[in-house]
Amino acid sequence: MMWYGQIGFIQSEEDLDRSALLMTLAMNGDAFKQWESIYVVTSFFAGTSDDLTYYEYLPAIEAAYGGVPEVSALIGNTDGWNTFRSLTAAMDPPAINSIPTMDDGDSDTKTTDANKGFRFMGQRFTIDEAIFQQLVYDNVQADASGNQRMLPDTLDVAAALGSDTAYSILEQQGDTGYAGYTENMETLRTNISQASDTLWTSSLYSNWLHTLTPLLEEKGEGYPSFMRSSQWAKKDLETFAGRYAELKHDTVLYAKQVMAEMGGGELPQWDDRGYVEPEVEVWTRFSNLATKTAEGLKSYGLLSEEDETNLNRLAQMADQFKTMSEKELSNTLLTDDEYDLIRNYGGNLEHF
């Protein structure tokens, strides 16, 4: 899948654009149905393609040739070919640059030329990678020492999603010293804060980011004093970064990981009652995410009975943690059953 997403038929190279036309024609019909059955499900998980695909190229072919032509009809049809070339040249380039390019003084043009083109199963657009794109060279320029910002930082995402704590750390690290960084960050924060719900519900990946964003919000009146401290804000930022790292991992690697068994002897008798981080909105969104995941997979006919049961259990657990969070915020003592759920949380997760 990675190979299909990265190997492109670059529009600026005529032979490759011709290959893209032929591949699109080859995909038409039954082959398209098979391709789409893979594409729509992976889009449900990770989002739609950032690159040009069959969806963009087939309409261009129809417009240039007056319909879907036979391959034999392409030979000698110079007018159709020239029209097709002009239509593909006018298509939007990808929002995210995934191709290393040399800086020769005309980097904008070169990057666009090296990236824009047809891909069989294009890599997916994600909000966080779009954030990164705007905060590295050459969208930001050198700092006072002449250094370029060649790599992004996880804190870029947190700051763009609204975390003042993350932005403060970036300032301390010197990241805001790169020319254009502050301006680009402000633009990103404004655009994201004004984004519609459609952006966050477009895929499970986007929905996960939306689920985590309450961790980045400043806790005001109504929260316990310890949750309104700068230390708690940093702890929440670390929680966000940890789950974000797992989210990135989940979208590129699907190998099973070895786990330790729960148990192994009697525990000493101590007061081991735990607590739930009182993030009511996070638990609410997590419950909704589990429910929507089950509904989406079921609609594609890809949800086994066991997986449906597990997703329903996840949603139920999130609802229970939401209830506990509300109790903690109102200084209401948890029940023994609720303390038991916290105590055995890891063991419950182990069996999903």
PLM features: what roles do these ranges have?
Residues 2-352:
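Long, non-catalytic protein-protein interaction scaffolds
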